[in-house]
């Protein structure tokens, strides 16, 4: 009997992309750092990545799995009204599929005590909640927060004037998650007064009774000032025993009002309360900022530039990072938008990674970050954290696809890849860490202390393989990725050189990924149409032909490894 479960389903849910793990190529001309170190805690290895965010997440997976403390994302809301740099008028099925693919990688990137924070409106919030339950596990749902993004009523609203967005909070492993608390505010401390000049300082009062009747705690207490007796209200009882209540009255911890005749209440002194408070699920604009505030912040940093319609203010991100991270932790935003997450993380002493594909990566994010690093950005949270500048970031772009088709339709290694990039790409695909040795020419990467990889575009002879095997030694192993090997069969090679594993480029990777697919973005113009069931069945012969169709056979005109010309 099949065990059934509750799940969210949609058209195309079973289809998953075979993502190519691209390498990241730094453009040092766009990387930026401060002219001097401001503090010993300055970070310079932050990353700004230009490219499709699904491919970028996949590119980060090998190096950063289990290392990200907090992911904050503000994906297009699928409302048709998001920022003009995105086209977010997507059907529910496409949107859910795109989000699922990203969330699965995000979960792998999170540390065991890490958390995910997603802003969303009520158009997709409930679908997204169920989707996140499926990806992260319902037990790892922490809370849904309501952030008041607008403070004014929209008078022309058809039904309700929309004033808030949601923030879904998930953790990778609930048992490991520890959330910080907010520091007490002046407004919270201002609630504490000292009307009786108590030498212990300011205090506030709370109920002295509990909402249940316990016989041992039902008795009269007497006001020291007037002698008036007070009983707990019907259906309730005092919170303390008679003996403890006598002590509290003697210690002047029970307040009967200035007249001495008021309902008694328990004093709570300011110096006795925690200097921090837990966050609530209602985040009002006074404490957490609003959209208009975010627009002003963006306009102040980017001259003559359009801004996002629903940007997030720095105060909102600061609150998230206060709760979810500590100084030095790594923060990821794969929908960088105007770069607020990175800017705030930078000012708060967190390390960060941001991903953005739109041109606003150049028009908004880079100029903004440069001003942050130079200390010129004194808006947002800068004054609150005493930001003086410092640190830096490295700018990366996704490498092109490793495999392309040459003019005869044959799959070959992209000629844009030099030897170093090819070695790094194959390390990533094969699960090795790219770490070229300065001592051993054949060590391009490693997966352990004794397992290595060597990448070459040469055709290796049996003599070369023998020399390589001798140098590697019997106590180590080497994966050899080469264009071809001759003078020996694969079976004989395995017997003759047990410390070598031979694979041919590009054959070894052809079935591993979707090569040449550069855009998995949320732009509907670039998405394929969802396959809808046809009203008429497709002819069986057509299906059979399609299923059994073989790839073109290489002919005598087949090009070299890098296409028409060898690199």
Task: Please tell me what each predicted stretch does.
Residues 1-14, 252-257, 468-469, 476-484, ...:
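Coupling/switch/interface segments within P-loop NTPase motor domains and analogous charged loops
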Residues 1-72, 79-101, 483-485, 508, ...:
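DnaQ-like (DEDDh/DEDDy) 3′-5′ exonuclease domain used for proofreading
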Residues 3, 8-20, 92-96, 123-125, ...:
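Conserved S-adenosyl-L-methionine
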Residues 3, 171-303, 318:
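Active-site-adjacent helix-turn-beta-strand microarchitecture at beta-sheet edges
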Residues 36-39, 54, 59-115, 123, ...:
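SAM-dependent methyltransferase catalytic-core segment centered on the flexible catalytic loop
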Residues 42-43, 47-55, 59, 292-330:
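Glycine-rich adenosyl-nucleotide cofactor-binding module
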Residues 112-113, 122-181:
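Signature of N6-adenine DNA methyltransferases within the class I
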Residues 353-567:
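PRPP-dependent phosphoribosyltransferase catalytic core
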């Amino acid at each position: 009997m099949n065990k059934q479960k509750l799940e969210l389903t949609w058209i195309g849910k079973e289809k998953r992309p075979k993502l190519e793990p691209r390498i990241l190529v730094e453009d040092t001309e766009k990387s930026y750092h401060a002219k001097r170190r401001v503090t010993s805690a300055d970070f310079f290895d932050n990353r700004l990545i230009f490219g499709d965010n699904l491919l970028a997440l996949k590119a980060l997976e090998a190096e950063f799995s289990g290392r990200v403390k907090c992911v904050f994302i503000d994906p297009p809301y699928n409302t048709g009204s998001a920022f003009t740099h995105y086209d977010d008028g997507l059907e529910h099925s496409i949107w859910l599929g795109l989000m699922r693919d990203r969330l699965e990688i995000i979960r792998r990137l999170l540390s065991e005590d890490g958390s995910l924070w997603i802003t969303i409106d009520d158009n997709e919030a409930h679908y997204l909640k169920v989707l996140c339950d499926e990806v992260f596990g319902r037990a790892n749902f922490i809370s849904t927060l309501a952030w008041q993004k607008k403070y004014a009523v929209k008078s022309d609203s058809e039904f309700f004037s929309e004033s808030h967005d949601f923030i879904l909070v998930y953790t990778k492993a609930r048992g490991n998650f520890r959330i910080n608390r907010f520091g007490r505010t002046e407004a919270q401390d201002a609630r504490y007064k000292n009307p009786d000049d108590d030498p212990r300082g300011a205090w506030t009062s709370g109920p002295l009774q509990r909402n249940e009747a316990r016989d041992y705690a039902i008795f009269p207490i007497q006001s020291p000032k007037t002698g008036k007796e007070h009983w707990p209200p019907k259906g309730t009882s005092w919170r303390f025993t008679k003996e403890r209540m006598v002590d509290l009255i003697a210690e002047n911890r029970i307040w009967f009002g200035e007249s001495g005749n008021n309902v008694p209440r328990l004093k709570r002194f300011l110096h006795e309360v925690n200097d921090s408070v837990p966050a609530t699920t209602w985040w009002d604009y006074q404490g957490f900022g609003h959209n208009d505030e975010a627009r002003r912040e963006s306009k102040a940093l980017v001259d003559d530039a359009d801004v996002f319609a629903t940007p997030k203010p720095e105060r909102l991100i600061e609150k998230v990072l206060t709760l979810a991270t500590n100084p030095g932790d790594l923060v990821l935003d794969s929908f960088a938008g105007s770069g607020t997450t990175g800017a705030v993380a930078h000012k708060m002493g967190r390390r960060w990674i941001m991903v953005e594909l739109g041109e606003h990566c150049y028009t908004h994010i880079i100029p903004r970050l440069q001003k942050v690093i130079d200390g010129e950005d004194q808006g947002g949270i800068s004054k609150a954290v005493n930001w003086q500048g410092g640190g830096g970031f490295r700018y990366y772009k996704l490498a092109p696809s490793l495999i392309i088709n040459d003019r005869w339709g044959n799959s070959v290694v992209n000629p844009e890849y030099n030897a170093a990039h090819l070695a790094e790409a194959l390390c990533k695909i094969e699960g090795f860490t790219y770490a070229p040795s300065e001592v051993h020419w054949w060590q391009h990467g490693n997966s352990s202390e004794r397992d290595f990889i060597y990448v070459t575009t040469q055709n290796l002879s049996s003599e070369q393989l023998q020399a390589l095997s001798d140098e590697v030694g019997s106590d180590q192993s080497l994966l050899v990725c080469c264009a071809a090997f001759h003078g020996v069969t694969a079976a004989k090679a395995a017997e003759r050189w047990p410390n070598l594993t031979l694979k041919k480029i590009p054959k070894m990777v052809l079935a591993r990924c979707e090569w040449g697919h550069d855009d998995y973005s949320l732009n509907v113009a670039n998405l394929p149409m969802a396959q809808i069931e046809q009203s008429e069945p497709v002819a069986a012969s057509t299906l059979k032909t399609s299923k059994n169709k073989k790839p073109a056979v290489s002919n005598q005109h087949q090009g070299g490894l890098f296409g028409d010309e060898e690199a």
